[in-house]
A protein has these predicted regions:
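Conserved beta-strand-loop-beta-strand hairpin that lines the nucleotide-binding pocket
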Residues: 79, 93, 109-138
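Short beta-to-alpha transition helix within the HATPase_c
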Residues: 53-70, 137-141
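Active-site alpha-helix of zinc metalloproteases
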Residues: 8
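Conserved ATP-binding N-box helix of the HATPase_c
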Residues: 11-27, 86-119
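Flexible, glycine-/charge-rich segments associated with ATP-binding catalytic modules
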Residues: 26, 140-160
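Conserved signal-transmission helix
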Residues: 1-3
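Conserved catalytic submotifs in the C-terminal HATPase_c
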Residues: 75-83
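Histidine phosphotransfer helical core of two-component systems
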Residues: 18-59, 82-88
Length: 160
């Protein structure tokens, strides 16, 4: 994607959030403005945790996906003890890609994808959850742990 297009999409998304924040303040809805403000900051903070990982292939796939595919909002939950995830970047990227390709066929409206990364002494656990109005729960991947019309969750365990 051309740099100007990327820049424009990023600015457009941020401008939309700031306009909504401004509207809440203008209408005197301080509670809604405060909640939205905290949500925006938390989203940036959580995304930064992911972007700081030593996983360039996974990060590149994520960035390409958010710029090209407007069907998903993303959330992150990252609790890693070490930088060992960097040793499994190719595996992580393949898992992310597999989940996203599967999820694209299951929703028509904007839906939330939550990526969770947890680490113990023995393994790294990656959980991908799609929540929203899921139209199809048939033929889920083998790594599926939950599948219904509200959530489809896939899990990958990487032994260290």
């Amino acid at each position: 994607m051309h740099n100007v297009e990327t820049y424009m999409k990023t600015k457009h998304d941020l401008a939309n959030q700031l306009q909504l924040l401004d509207a809440y303040f203008t209408l005197g809805q301080r509670d809604k403005a405060e909640r939205l403000s905290k949500n925006i900051v938390a989203q940036f903070r959580d995304e930064q945790q992911f972007l700081k990982l030593n996983c360039p292939k996974s990060i590149q796939y994520y960035v390409d996906t958010i710029l090209d595919e407007r069907l998903f909002e993303w959330a992150f939950e990252i609790e890693l003890l070490t930088s060992a995830i960097g040793n499994y970047d190719e595996i992580l990227k393949a898992f992310i890609q597999t989940c996203i390709m599967d999820y694209k066929n299951r929703v028509d409206t904007k839906s939330l994808v939550t990526m969770s990364l947890f680490e113990t002494d023995d393994e790294i656990e990656c959980i991908f959850a799609l929540t929203g109005n899921i139209k199809d729960t048939s033929n889920v991947l083998l790594s599926c742990t939950i599948a219904n019309d509200e959530i489809i969750e896939y899990k990958l365990e990487i032994r260290k």
